[in-house]
Amino acid sequence: MTEMNATESSEKKSLNFIEQIVEKDLKEGKNGGKVQTRFPPEPNGYLHIGHAKAICMDFGIAKKYGGVCNLRFDDTNPTKEDVEYVESIKEDIQWLGFQWGNEYYASDYFQQLWDFAIRLIKEGKAYVDEQTSEEIAVQKGTPTQPGTESPYRNRPVEESLDLFQKMNAGEIEEGKMVLRAKIDMASPNMHFRDPIIYRVVKTPHHRTGDTWKAYPMYDFAHGQSDYFEGVTHSLCTLEFVPHRPLYDLFVDWVKEGKDLDDNRPRQYEFNKLNLSYILLSKRNLLILVKEGLVNGWDDPRMPTLCGFRRRGYSPESIHKFVDKIGYTTYDALNDFALLESAVREDLNARATRVSAVLNPVKLILTNYPEGQVEEMEAVNNPEDPNSPVHTIEFSRELWIEREDFMENAPKKYFRMTPGQEVRLKNAYIVKCTGCKKDEDGNVIEVYAEYDPHTKSGMPEANRKVKGTLHWVSCNHCLKAEVRLYDRLWKVENPRDAMAAIREEKNCSALEAMKEMINPDSLNILQECYVEKFLADSKPLDYLQFQRIGYFTPDKDSTPEHLVFNRTVSLKDTWSKISRK
């Protein structure tokens, strides 16, 4: 194999299967060699981590092949939609680093879809059905048994046209009539058994108000909207595989049987994102919010993009994660640890290192001059050779972590214990001399002596010492609230666990959720101390509290009351727990 062929082969192997399809379509000249995609969210909730995978695919394909990705809101159900969701969706997409070509709405095409439905009725391809939803469900049959025709299937065209007009005029109550496509009640594909394409909804629409009372169903609106916009590659998840023949049929019909092999959208499916310890159903997330089990859609424990953003995840870390898991044609449960690993990898390269003490005990350097204060130099990020530095004040009295001192330590304890030396990061080597306890035997002060010749940068500072501790000066620090967030669920597969609990106990989704919630998903610490460098920190600043984990200021944080959220611990502790 030549060097060029080897390179081409390597590039070919690196393409995911959707990219291979797109390249094949381009090579064959389909749709005039154009690539156009769309991201079509329904504005009925906040985007979650599962949507991020679809966003990266839709926008990524368009960018890679010089095309455009449009944003189209699938606003065909006014009972659940709101402008609030529209704005949050746009914010999340931009936060991920993408910009859409055009902003569209399915409601932009309501008139075209209506006209198309009228044409289908006139052509004998659609009819108004007056059966109840229960009757229609039974009449559709089963995957192994054909359906039976509706008694209204062959009603006169003029009658269906008249009733369809009444549906939209508000003269028909919700649930009393629907418009169905006339296809094949014996088809092995259940979606071909005269699917409902219009229903009555009297709730005002957030864009069109009371103009429409008859609304198109997703399967009817989606493919046609793709066609009207000029979408070439309609990318969606695997549950839509059975819908594809219907998608193609409706596109054939809207094209009136002309030029069927070109200038049309084609649907391709990839696996959706499934994560351990995560529940992604919008319906269940809404229960969490409404019942107060979390503090809103942007609660840092939520799998929403705004929740991850508030928790301190960077958009780049989510891109890294999506790249790692890739796109396939089969569903799998991905380990949440993979996402956290991507976050750690990204934040390690970008987070500013700072000192924070979460469980403080006072350390007094008995031989350090009283009243003396030194400014120590701390590198913001040692991973960056061009990293700036900041200063941190050092004095006689310091706060250290309570777990960094042990009066009677085991042999391999390398932190602070009487007679043992440790290094205070960016400062001096000190030797512990003892401690002071209260009446209950609790340590309230630790004592040590510093070696003035071991300041960071001095020759003696290179003396071999196994333990290095972080600290902040008692008189030169800021008090802070720290929120230690962890996984919301204590079960690996909350979706399956919830189904099992509900079946076993015949209980509601809410009751099942309460059984699965991790009681340690949020631990709030009030008596924490951070260095003064963080006085001006703001949300979306990426920080590493040295030796503890990655953190970010919360939106609740103020100069008078600093609040920090833990993004992720420095190491994966859940893997150890799950092995026990």
Model-derived regions: residue spans:
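Long, charged, mostly alpha-helical binding arms that flank functional sites
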Residues: 262-342
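Residue-level signal for inorganic ion chemistry
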Residues: 29, 58, 89, 120, ...
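Basic/polar N-terminal segments that are highly enriched at the extreme N-terminus
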Residues: 1-13, 580
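Conserved short loop/turn motifs at secondary-structure junctions
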Residues: 40-43, 72-80, 102-111, 134, ...
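A glycine-rich helix N-cap at a beta->alpha junction
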Residues: 85-111, 116-119, 124-127
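Core subunits and conserved enzymes of cellular information-processing
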Residues: 240, 244, 248-250, 316-319, ...
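Active-site cores that bind ATP or allylic diphosphates and position pyrophosphate for catalysis
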Residues: 71, 75-77, 83, 105, ...
